[in-house]
């Protein structure tokens, strides 16, 4: 199922590549491009590197039609599928395979040195990615095979939590909360503070109010002759000065001041003889 989901991606395309038949290697010293007929390539065309899954494919195709000439599957790089020559950086030896499993070694070369560099780097990057994917898959398998930690609470297991400065003590009784009327608690005054009660505002109004003196009543009788004599007699003149009003804040001083402010009228003799 995983192989069906894999898609083919293109890693590198070079429009000009030459193919050479190479002689068998006589020793393990490596291949040399100088042993090839570099001026007479056996085939020229286009090179394309693709990848499907972890395998890279070097495909030699026709420049015009795109027909496949040869294909070299690469499972590891550097490896036996792709080798560099010992005397040049522009030539390589690849192992091509057909559908029946037969294989052969041929030489390829690039005219431009930059094309050879891109060919080499494309293969290196692909297999570097393959190595990283392999390590990640191994780590995930190791994590799955490890015994899982049981972080749940066992039956009857408890823990103790400390929140800020509040710590729970074993066997300690909680302090009762004082509740006011209606379930509302009053906050205590701040430490070191003094509560000052302002004087009532009504005291200023009472101290500034002056009670008027009462009107004195007449000492004469109610007969007609007395009324006539009172009309003829001159009005009495008071010589006493009223007492000063106290502006003290004492509430009872206003009442004593009002009583003392009443003038004392002395009876004066009348010039008419009363009958």
UniProtKB/Swiss-Prot annotation:
Expressed primarily in brain (at protein level). Residues 168-275 are annotated as: Disordered. One of its GO terms (cellular component) is clathrin vesicle coat. Pfam families: DUF1681. CDD domains: PHear_NECAP. The modification Phosphothreonine is found at residue 211. The keyword Protein transport applies. Its main location: membrane. Keywords: Cell membrane, Cytoplasmic vesicle, Endocytosis, Membrane, Phosphoprotein, Protein transport, Repeat, Transport. The WXXF motifs mediate binding of accessory proteins to the ear-domain of AP-1, GGAs and AP-2 through hydrophobic interactions. Selective binding to the GAE domains of AP-1 or to the alpha-ear domain of AP-2 is tuned by the acidic context surrounding the motif and the properties of the second residue of the motif itself. The WXXF motif 1, which is preceded by an acidic residue and has a glycine in second position mediates specific interaction with AP-1. The WXXF motif 2, which is followed by the C-terminal carboxyl group negative charge, allows specific interaction with AP-2. A motif (WXXF motif 1) lies at residues 252-255. Gene3D superfamilies: Pleckstrin-homology domain (PH domain)/Phosphotyrosine-binding domain (PTB) (2.30.29.30). This is Adaptin ear-binding coat-associated protein 1. Changing residue 274 to A/M/N/S/T: No effect on binding to AP-2. Interacts with AP1G1 and AP2A1 components of the adapter protein complexes AP-1 and AP-2. Interacts with the GAE domain proteins GGA1, GGA2 and GGA3. Residues 233-248 have a biased composition (Low complexity). Residues 256-275 have a biased composition (Polar residues). Residues 187-201 have a biased composition (Pro residues).
């Amino acid at each position: 199922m995983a192989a069906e989901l894999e898609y083919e991606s293109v890693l590198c395309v070079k429009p000009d590549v030459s193919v050479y038949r190479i002689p068998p290697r006589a020793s393990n010293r490596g291949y040399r491009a100088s042993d090839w007929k570099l001026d007479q390539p056996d085939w020229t065309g286009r090179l394309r590197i693709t990848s499907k899954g972890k395998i890279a494919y070097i495909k030699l195709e026709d420049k015009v039609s795109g027909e496949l000439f040869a294909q070299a599957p690469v499972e590891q790089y550097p490896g036996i599928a792709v080798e560099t020559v010992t005397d040049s950086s522009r030539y390589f030896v690849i192992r091509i395979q057909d559908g029946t499993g037969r294989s052969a070694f041929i030489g390829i070369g690039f005219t431009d040195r930059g094309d050879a560099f891109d060919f080499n780097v494309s293969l290196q990057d692909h297999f570097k990615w393959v190595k990283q994917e392999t390590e990640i898959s191994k780590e995930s398998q190791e994590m799955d095979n490890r015994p899982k930690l049981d972080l749940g609470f066992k039956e009857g297991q408890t823990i103790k939590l400390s929140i800020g400065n509040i710590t729970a003590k074993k066997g300690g009784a909680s302090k009762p909360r004082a509740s006011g009327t209606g379930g509302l608690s009053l906050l205590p005054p701040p430490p070191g503070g003094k509560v000052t009660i302002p004087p009532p505002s009504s005291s200023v109004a009472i101290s500034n109010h002056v009670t008027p003196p009462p009107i004195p009543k007449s000492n004469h009788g109610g007969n007609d002759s007395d009324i006539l004599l009172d009309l003829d007699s001159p009005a009495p003149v008071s010589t006493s000065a009223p007492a000063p009003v106290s502006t003290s804040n004492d509430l009872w001083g206003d009442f004593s001041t009002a009583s003392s402010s009443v003038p004392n009228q002395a009876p004066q003799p009348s010039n008419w003889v009363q009958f």
